[in-house]
Amino acid sequence: MNWITNYVRPKINSMLGRREMPENLWIKDPSTGEMVFHKDLESNQFVIPSSGHHMRIKAKDRLRFFFDNGEYTTLEAPKVPVDPLKFRDEKKYIDRLKDYRTRTGMDDAIVNGLGTIDGLPIVATVQDFGFMGGSLGMGAGEAIIQGFEKAIELKRPLVLFAASGGARMQEGILSLMQLPRTTVAVEMLKEAGLPYIVVLTNPTTGGVTASYAMLGDIHIAEPGALIGFAGPRVIEQTIREKLPEGFQSADYLMEHGMVDMVVSRLELKDTIARLLKIMTRQPGNSDAPEHEKTEATDKAA
């Protein structure tokens, strides 16, 4: 044995040997099949640079991209009874909750963040589709109400990012109760004279579209978002007719007056900051397009 065997060869083998590759190093564009480097995608707020496809993102990433300098504080999630119905399908609901909490690091599907956008203090309530499809249960409902109450307490506008498949079936009527409860919270914010902007992301469906997600002063949709009460497949099976192309897409809903604008995630922060400054009569509105001033004023009224 000599120094070549003991030192050089192992060094070469280590340099040329196979390295462990992180599973999420590359992300596939669902719209084109293109493979995109994860770091490039993250630096572009998880919008595919070539196609403009908006990937789903975690709630904490959403808050980081949205607030000034990525700085914000979160509200502690409210405590609610866990699995009061003792529900079980393929597995116990309480075990399913534990799995999602371990996987996501979240207590439930909603995160409330406090921070500023373009210097304006706001409350942001973000729904995370990665937690049981963003479904609305007692925990999520209580967190949404908490966000509205905090906005009223601090006299701040509230921006809500919706992403949900609807009510959480494992909680039955307790889940459905959150629809009127969150609706009341919206009305409390409006009675306080505070702006409420909703950003509809992909997907926003089910009971959330029958409550807080469609009660904003202004509704903004991300490009390509699916928005509706029932999914297109369910509707087609019910009416036994083929739906129009693009039905329930963000652009389709804007064309038919259901949302006010479709805005790229890359432009959301600046757009919302301009709108809120108009709605709260803050300085620095002179660069806002005239049609945005008119729409925002009409909505606020």
From Swiss-Prot:
Q: Does the keyword Disulfide bond apply?
A: no
What top-level branch of life does the organism fall under? Bacteria
Cell location: Cytoplasm
Q: Which GO terms describe its molecular function?
A: acetyl-CoA carboxylase activity; ATP binding; carboxyl- or carbamoyltransferase activity
Pathway where this protein functions? Lipid metabolism; malonyl-CoA biosynthesis; malonyl-CoA from acetyl-CoA: step 1/1
PROSITE patterns associated with the record: COA_CT_NTER
Keyword line = ATP-binding, Cytoplasm, Fatty acid biosynthesis, Fatty acid metabolism, Lipid biosynthesis, Lipid metabolism, Nucleotide-binding, Transferase
Q: Per its UniProt entry, what is the enzyme's top EC class, as one word?
A: transferase
What this protein is called in its record is: Acetyl-coenzyme A carboxylase carboxyl transferase subunit beta
- Please list the reactions this protein catalyses: N(6)-carboxybiotinyl-L-lysyl-[protein] + acetyl-CoA = N(6)-biotinyl-L-lysyl-[protein] + malonyl-CoA
Which Gene3D superfamilies does this chain map to? 2-enoyl-CoA Hydratase, Chain A, domain 1
Q: Which residues are in the CoA carboxyltransferase N-terminal domain?
A: 25-294
**What EC number(s) has UniProt assigned to this enzyme?**
2.1.3.15
Basic and acidic residues compositional bias: what residue ranges? 288-301
What is the annotated quaternary arrangement, including any partners?
Acetyl-CoA carboxylase is a heterohexamer composed of biotin carboxyl carrier protein (AccB), biotin carboxylase (AccC) and two subunits each of ACCase subunit alpha (AccA) and ACCase subunit beta (AccD).
Please list where the region (Disordered) is annotated.
Answer: 282-301
Disulfide links within the chain: none
